[in-house]
Amino acid sequence: MTIYHFVGIKGTGMSALAQVLHDMKCVVQGSDYDKRFFTQEALEARGIPIFPFSAQNIRENMVVIAGNAFPDTHEEIVAARELGVPVIRYHQFLGDFLQKFTSIAVTGAHGKTSTTGLLAHVMQGAKPTSYLIGDGSGKGREGSEYFVFEACEYRRHFLAYSPDYAIMTNIDFDHPDYFANIEDVFSAFQQMAWQVKKGIIACGDDEYLQKIQAKVPVVFYGFGEDNDFQARNIVKTPEGTSFDVFVRHTFFASFHIPRYGDHNVLNALAVIALCHYEGIDVNIIQERLKTFPGVKRRFHEKMLGSQVLIDDYAHHPTEIRATIEAARQKYPERQIVAIFQPHTYTRTQTFLDEFAESLSLADAVYLCDIFSSAREHQGKLSIEDLRAKIEGAKLLDEEQVDVLKQHDNAVLIFMGAGDIQKFQEKYEQSVHV
């Protein structure tokens, strides 16, 4: 009996893949650091064992799936090679695995996770569908016809995939520790486009995606007149967003989503276009769009006394802007307070002015110290460099979070890709004391 052992099982993609294999009746286990991570809940709910890192975890009857954050010198990977146990990197394993299904990759600088989650939710209403989402969620269904998965451009990992379809949400300059500039990012997406086997659904409002070439049909969606799928007559309320969809200038149907901001209309349009292409009944699409519960760490709301607390993964200026605008749509009468933890020195340095500009859309700004990634050690700048560019911005220390209590009846948005959640947790504890 083969055991699939995940080195770094708490990673968002790794956790999701482990869940998919477990659901498909594979024997799964993994190892990681002791520190608690939000992906653990789903693993623990399935009874998937999680061990501390140790060479002793590796046995001969295993296939080792290695997370991208761990080098070949990691003790478990070394032990596996010494035993002659296969070691497969996450994206390579996934690339082979998805060949069993009609596969749909969702990629783009922003909106990948929300769009993957939404597509999986809608498709499940029509066909047996398995999915892997970048928020750490995965679901495997035996006999699945479709496999919906998030494909990340970082280090060109998505080139390990040759999907049947690709949804491309946008192209933007991110991951400056790897990509040289926007042209470098575009070249990665162009390489990915050549590998798609049936069709590409791309946002036609994005100037770079308009230039994408492919061997398969490219269907464009967006707000602009030239798109194959166009959203018109958009109505935004505190309850959500309604819009009409026109397919090549002919009315198709009306839709409502309990979501906020233009970016969520675009995400829904991408899903509508893909489902239309695959012949899924419009009534199913309409109903499923209304019932989408959202994905983890994307505009996740909770009430705390008179305040609304929102947890969001936004870590790029474009995402911060979209999140603040979404909060304004839902809570037009409330003060919007941004609490932001920059993620990586490289990204903070590269987008310093853009971060200042997007955060300034909030009514008040608090900044937490820069969270450095496993890939970097230290940077030349400090959080003070960003604070100096935002009028009235204050630095927030984990031990002084109760200063947020002064924002009565406000919306507090905790944003970042590091461990910003610990600030929110500390604040919630301080309120309950």
UniProtKB/Swiss-Prot annotation:
Pfam families: Mur_ligase (PF01225), Mur_ligase_C (PF02875), Mur_ligase_M (PF08245). One of its GO terms (cellular component) is cytoplasm. This is UDP-N-acetylmuramate--L-alanine ligase. InterPro entries: Mur-like_cat_sf, Mur_ligase_C, Mur_ligase_C_dom_sf, Mur_ligase_cen, Mur_ligase_N, MurCDEF_pg_biosynth, UDP-N-AcMur_Ala_ligase_MurC. Keywords: ATP-binding, Cell cycle, Cell division, Cell shape, Cell wall biogenesis/degradation, Cytoplasm, Ligase, Nucleotide-binding, Peptidoglycan synthesis. Its main location: cytoplasm. PANTHER family: UDP-N-ACETYLMURAMATE--L-ALANINE LIGASE, UDP-N-ACETYLMURAMATE--L-ALANINE LIGASE-RELATED. Its EC number is 6.3.2.8. Cell wall formation. GO terms for molecular function: ATP binding; UDP-N-acetylmuramate-L-alanine ligase activity. SUPFAM superfamilies: MurCD N-terminal domain, MurD-like peptide ligases, catalytic domain, MurD-like peptide ligases, peptide-binding domain. ATP binds at G108, A109, H110, G111, K112, T113, S114. Belongs to the MurCDEF family. Pathway: Cell wall biogenesis; peptidoglycan biosynthesis. It is found in: Cytoplasm. It comes from Anoxybacillus flavithermus (strain DSM 21510 / WK1). It is an enzyme of class 6 (ligase). It catalyses: UDP-N-acetyl-alpha-D-muramate + L-alanine + ATP = UDP-N-acetyl-alpha-D-muramoyl-L-alanine + ADP + phosphate + H(+). It comes from the Bacteria. One of its GO terms (biological process) is regulation of cell shape.
